[in-house]
Amino acid sequence: SDPVIKHLPGLAGTAYDGVTVEQVATMTSGVKWNEDYTDPKSDVAQMLLVAPVPGELQSITYAKRLTREAPAGSKWVYKTLETNLLGDIV
């Protein structure tokens, strides 16, 4: 599978560097994420509030804040951001 940065070069140097498109599609990127809809400080809530950066996709802007919690391919965690990244690719 292609590296995700091949299709979204704005992710180079982020926690998504070294992650494949397949790992994003299977939500096994290893990127730390909080999908708690009841927590206003969760990633899923904060992602929607990120200030726009001219010429940059909102998903890329938010992804730049994230860190890795596990090696890519080793842990499944549902991440709304990753569905957005896949949409950005296609």
Please place each PLM-identified region on the residue numbering.
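Catalytic-site signature segments of enzymes, centered on catalytic residues
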Residues: 5, 36-90
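Active-site helix/loop module of the DD-peptidase/beta-lactamase fold
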Residues: 1-32, 36, 65
